[in-house]
Amino acid sequence: MTRPLETPPDIEVPVLIVGGSMVGLSTALFLSHYGIQAMAVERHERTAIHPRAGHFHLRTLELLRSVGLEEVVARTSAEAFFPNGGINAVQSLAGGETASFISNLNAGVEEFSPTRRLFIAQQALEPILRSRAEELGADLRYSTEVVSVVDDGEGVTTVIRDKASGQERTVRSRYLVASDGWRSQRRAQLGIETRGQGLLSRSATIYFRADCRELLAGTHLGVIYVLNERLRGFFRFEKSLQSGFLGVATLGDPTRPGALDVSAGFTTDTAVELVRAAIGVPDIDVEIQDVAHWEATAALADRYRGGRIFLAGDAAHVVPPYGGFGGNTGVQDAHNLASKLALVLDGTAGEALLDTYEAERRPVGALTVDQAFSRYIRRLAPEFLDEQTPELVDDFSMELGYRYHSPAVLTEDDDKAVDQAVVGHPREALGRPGSRAPHVALRVDDHDRSVLDLLGRDFVVLAGPAGQVWAEAAERASKELGLPLSAYVVGSDTPVADVEGRFADAYGLSDAGVALVRPDGFIAWRSRDLAEDPEAALTDALRAVLCR
C-alpha cells in the first residue's frame, strides 16, 4: 500500500468526481443537495454537444423533482419534444408502421408517480444540472484531465491538469467517484473486469435537417425504429419535424462480410443516402449537420468499488440505447451512492454502509444490461431472437419496481419468498423493505403533494393515522442517535391528509403501523402494526440500516 500523502495538497475535498458528463454532474448535484462538498473534473471544455441520452424515466424525474429541477426540465423538454410521444417501428417513414411498442409515453403513470416521462436532449439537460449543482456549492472544472490517482487506504490523492494552462494541482479526497465512461481509466487502474453480451453494433448517429412534416403530421412520436433492407436504426425528431437524428446500427457480428460498417469510410454522401432510405423518399432534401460514431455494447463491471474508489454510470455498466436505460440507470447510481457517502461523511453511518452501494446497484445494473439487450433484439434485430434472449420486464417494473437487498434493508421474516427478487411490479411492492416508497397523493397545508415530496434529505418515519406514538418515538430516537429524523402521521383527517385513502394499503400497514424511509427514498424497515416498544424498535432499526 502506498504511504499517505506527506506534502499538503493544493485542494482538499470530501469527494472528487472524475467525469463531468450527466452522471458526474448528477453525483455532484446530489452530494451538494445532501450538504457534502464535491468537486468534479471533466476533460471536455463544456457540457454535452450532442443529444445522446434523451428518454428519461419516472424515477429519474422523481429524483430531479427532489432537487427542484422537475419544472425546468419539463419546460425545456416541451420546447423541443411532444410531451407524450410514442415509440413505434416502420419500414420507412413513408412506408407505414410495422409495430407499436408504446402508444403514449405517459399512459397510466398517474397511479405510480407524481412525475411524467419525457424526452430531453442531453445537451439541454446537462447545463440545467450544472447550474443547479453550482448553485448548491459544487466545484465543477472543465478542460481538466486526470494525471494520476493513488488510493492509500486513508484517502485518495489525485493529480489534475488544466488543459489550457498545463498547470497541475494535487487534490486530496476521502473518496473518488469514477464516472468516466465505459472506457474508464479508473476501472482499468483497479483491475476490474467486465462481462456481458459485449459489442453488439458499430453505430453512427447522423444529425440532419429534412422536412418530414407531411410524413409525420399528427403522429407525435418520440422514437421511430426503422427496419428495411438498407439499414436498421432509429429516428428521434424534434417536434418541428424538420430536424433530428438517425442512429444506424450494424446487426450481428460487425466484422462479418457484407456488414454495414459505419466505423470507417463513412462519407456525407453515405449519410444522406441512409437518411433518405430511412425516410423512404429518395429525392428528399437532406442537410447533414454532424455524424458521431459509437459502439453499442452490453456489459457490466465485476465490481463497483475498489477501496475508496467507486464506479458509477457507464464506468460500471454500458447498455445499447434501446429502452433509454443508460443515462437513467447512471443517475440512479449517483443518487444511491451520494446518499450513502453523505451519511458516512457526516458521521451518521458506519463505513460499512458504503459496501451496500455495490450490493444494491450491481444487481440492478445486471438486470438493466439484460433488458436493454432484449429490447435491442426485439426492436431492431428480431431475426436474432431465440430462447437465450431475456424475457421482457415491463417498463413500470424496470423504472419503479427494482428492489434492494443489503444490510441497509431489514427484510421481514414472512418476505423470504420474494427476498431475492431484483424486480417486481410497483403495484405489488406493497411497502416491502428494499422497495421504493410508493407514491400516494396527499394534501398538505392546502396544497396537493405526493408522499415523495416528504422525502429526500433525511430518514423519514411515515405512520398510519393511529401512529402518533411512532412520531413521538422518532423524536426520541433522533436525539439518542444524533441524526435528523422527520416523522409524519398520514390519515384522512391529519395535517398530512391521505386524500384518496390509499396510504395504508400502498405501504402494507395497519392504522398503527409505520415505515422507515431512507434518504434515497427506499423503504429500510417497517412495522406493520404497533410495536411493543416503538422507540426501541425504531432505534434498533436505524442502528442496523446505518451499519453502526
Swiss-Prot record:
Source organism, top-level taxon: Bacteria
Cofactor note: Binds 1 FAD per subunit.
Reactions catalysed: 4-methyl-5-nitrocatechol + NADPH + O2 = 2-hydroxy-5-methylquinone + nitrite + NADP(+) + H2O + H(+); 4-methyl-5-nitrocatechol + NADH + O2 = 2-hydroxy-5-methylquinone + nitrite + NAD(+) + H2O + H(+)
Activity regulation info: Activated by magnesium or manganese ions. Inhibited by concentrations of 4-methyl-5-nitrocatechol (MNC) above 2 mM.
Co-factor(s): FAD
Keyword NAD (UniProt): yes
Annotated EC: 1.14.13.210
SUPFAM superfamilies: FAD/NAD(P)-binding domain
Keywords: Aromatic hydrocarbons catabolism, FAD, Flavoprotein, Monooxygenase, NAD, NADP, Oxidoreductase
Signal peptide, first to last residue: none
Record's protein name: 4-methyl-5-nitrocatechol 5-monooxygenase
Organism in which the protein naturally occurs: Burkholderia sp
